[in-house]
Amino acid sequence: MQTSDITTLYRPVGPAELELIKQSGWTKFPPRLPEQPIFYPVMNEQYAIQIARDWNVPASGSGFVTKFAVRTEYASKFEIQNVGGEIHNELWVPAEELEDFNSNIVGQIEVTKEFK
């Protein structure tokens, strides 16, 4: 969802990443690992649910969908990539820009769904 000032994004995460988000006070995403050059929140909850349920649960025993808002003016500098079907849109943020991305999050990151 997008208003003129903020864009709502979703991020499917496993339990380890969720714990790091919690430790940040629900205000930022943790740095990417060296083998993860892109941070890619997704553009809709349906796609985030699919990843959390179908990928995170088998990989780590549980999956969570997080929802957060980011300043539209900032988010618009990144490309939206379609990686499959109609719902499979991701915002591709280079890992080295994640700190700036985090500083443009409005409010807190919230968990909207949990899968086990």
Residue spans of the language-model regions?
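Conserved NAD+-utilizing ADP-ribose enzyme module
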Residues: 1-39, 46-116
